[in-house]
A protein has these predicted regions:
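Non-catalytic interface/linker regions that flank or bridge core catalytic/transmembrane domains
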Residues: 1-45, 49
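Amphipathic, non-membrane alpha-helical segments in soluble helical-bundle scaffolds
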Residues: 26-29, 56-60, 93-96
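Active-site flanking loop/helix segments enriched in acidic
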Residues: 38-62, 133-134
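Divalent metal-dependent catalytic cores for phosphoryl transfer on phosphate-bearing substrates
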Residues: 49, 55, 75-79, 84-134
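Divalent metal-coordination and catalytic microenvironments
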Residues: 66
């Protein structure tokens, strides 16, 4: 189960924005976040049409999952033989992880659209309409 499934779309959006604002401090970071919020479908787009994240908010959920996994890997790898639970990433490392993970699929904004599709219902054998991404 991912963050979106556990907490809902609005909470996932807030979580993304909190991570972004807390960790990304480069020039124009605020403009980037504003662009994502106001001019793209980043927070509602799917991450694919058929595979993981092929649902509303899938791109957001995928980006958050990548962030949390990458951060855990970075802490584990950088901690070495130390207790990973005690290791803290530097501000620069936190920023790097946030940028890489949260924005790695930003090129997918505006790529998918919801359309009516047709499929054969396996239970009834009848063709039916459904909403799917293309």
């Amino acid at each position: 189960m991912n963050f979106l499934e556990m907490n809902g779309l609005q909470t996932a959006q807030t979580h993304f924005k909190d991570i972004f604002r807390d960790n990304i401090h480069r020039d124009y970071a605020d403009a980037m976040l504003d662009w994502l919020e106001r001019e793209t479908d980043f927070f509602t787009a799917p991450s694919s049409t058929k595979y993981h994240g092929a649902h509303t908010g899938g791109l957001l959920a995928h980006s958050l999952n990548v962030y949390h996994r990458l951060r855990d890997i970075a802490i584990r790898d950088l901690a070495g033989k130390e207790d990973p639970g005690k290791y803290r990433l530097s501000e620069e490392q936190e920023e790097t992880v946030a940028i890489i993970a949260l924005l790695h699929d930003v090129c997918k904004v505006g790529c998918y659209r919801l359309e009516t599709k047709r499929r054969k219902n396996p239970e009834t054998g009848r063709w039916e309409d459904y909403e799917g991404y293309t």
